[in-house]
Amino acid sequence: MIKTPSLVSLLHPACLSGKLRVRSACLDDWANIEMLYQHARRRTPRLWWWEEYLHHPLFLVVEQRDTLVGALFAWADESPVAWVRLAVLADSLPLDRWFDAVLPVLIDRGQRFQGSQTLAWMDYDDWAADALHQRGFLRWEEVITLEVTLPHKDVESTSDVMFRPATHADLDALVAIDHAAFLPHWWQSSQTMARRLAASAYFSVACEKGTQQVVAYIEGGRQGDTRAHINRIAVHPDWQGFGIGARLMRSALITFHQSGVRTVSLNTQRSNRRAQRLYHQLGFRPTGDTTTVWTLDL
C-alpha cells in the first residue's frame, strides 16, 4: 500500500532521496494525488477532469520510498495531439529527475495507446520551460488573456444568420465546426463538447436562416458573481468574414451584462491577429497574462 504523504514528506529534501518508480495510476491514488496537488508549487491548473482517467495507461504516478511524489497525465481528445492535462511533483523533487523518469514512459504509451503524433504542454507560470526545452520541446504558440468591462462597444455586422441556444442535437455540427476552424491542437471531442454543453452558463449557436445549418458557436461560463469567461468561439471557415463572430460575441456580452456580470475575459493565440482585431473593437484589452505552449513531435 502506498503511504499517504504528509506535508513534511512532500517538502523535506531528506525524504526525497532514492530511486523513482513510475507506474500506472489507479483509483486508490486519488487521495494522495489530491494532497500532493494541494501543497505542491509546481503543478498545472485544474482545467480537465483528470480524476475520471485514473484507470488509463496514460495516467502515471511517480513513487519514492513508497510515497507518491508526482503525477503526469496526457490525453488526446480525438486528436493527434495529446495535451498534458495534469503535471504535479513534490517541491523538493528535482524537476530533471522527475522528467527523466516519467516523460519517456508517457511518450511511449501515448504513441501505443492513442497514436499520438505530438505532445503539447501549456506552461503556466513557466516552471517547466527550461526542462521542456532541454528535452526537445519547441515554443509553438503564446496564449494571451484579454478582458472587457461591460457594457461593451458595439460592432456593425451584416450576417444573415439567427441565434439560438445549443442543444445535444447540435453536437456533431459543433465538432465539425471545431475541426474545420482550428488546428488539431485545439480540437474537442463530442464527449468534451457534451460536457461543456451541460455545464456552461452560456452556449449559443449561429444558424443559416434558410437551411438552419449550424455555422458557428460560442460558449462561456461564470466566474463568481460579476465575472465571466468566454471559453470558446468558432466560425466555420466557409462562413468567416460575414460578421458572425462579432454578432455571437455581442449577444454573449449582452446576456452576461444583463445577468450581473461586469467583466468578461477570454484567451486567444498571440498569432491570431484577426481575432484580436475583433476583440479590440469590442473593447477587450490585454491583461498582460501570457502562457507558453510547448510541443514535442513524437
Label every PLM stretch briefly.
Residues 12-13, 37-65, 73, 182-210, ...:
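Active-site rim helix/loop that mediates acceptor-substrate recognition in acyltransferases
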Residues 14-33, 162-174:
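A short beta-loop-alpha structural element at the N-terminal edge
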Residues 47-103, 218-228:
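Conserved donor-binding loop and adjoining core beta-sheet/short helix segment
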Residues 118-122, 230, 264-268:
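Conserved hydrophobic beta-strand within the GNAT/NAT acetyltransferase core sheet
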Residues 123-141, 242, 246, 270-288:
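Conserved active-site alpha-helix within GNAT-family acetyltransferase domains
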